[in-house]
Amino acid sequence: MGRKKESFENMLEKLETIVNSMDNGEITLEDSMKSYEEGIKLCNKLYKVLKDAEGKIKILEDNKEEDFENS
């Protein structure tokens, strides 16, 4: 079966957990490196979601301006 798409909020929560675990300094260097790698991947996914949302909003705003001008 296909993978269920993770929500923005769930990814952000995972990232916050990773940051907190790295901040407390109680994990090994190896675990820190794994967490860092996972955190970077999550950051990239979150950035993409935000950029996609920004693009959709821009399209909606542009369409709204066109509708207003044609009224």
Curated annotation (Swiss-Prot):
UniProt keyword Hydrolase present: yes
Pfam families for this protein: Exonuc_VII_S (PF02609)
EC class of the enzyme, as a word: hydrolase
One Gene Ontology term, aspect cellular component: exodeoxyribonuclease VII complex
Subcellular location: Cytoplasm
The entry's keywords: Cytoplasm, Exonuclease, Hydrolase, Nuclease
Keyword Chaperone listed: no
Enzyme Commission no: 3.1.11.6
Membrane-crossing residue ranges in chain numbering: none
One GO BP annotation of this record: DNA catabolic process
Known catalytic reactions: Exonucleolytic cleavage in either 5'- to 3'- or 3'- to 5'-direction to yield nucleoside 5'-phosphates
Chief localisation class: cytoplasm
Family annotation (NCBIfam families): PRK00977.1-4, xseB
Function of the molecule: Bidirectionally degrades single-stranded DNA into large acid-insoluble oligonucleotides, which are then degraded further into small acid-soluble oligonucleotides.
Subunit structure: Heterooligomer composed of large and small subunits.
Family per similarity comment: Belongs to the XseB family.
Protein name listed in UniProt: Exodeoxyribonuclease 7 small subunit
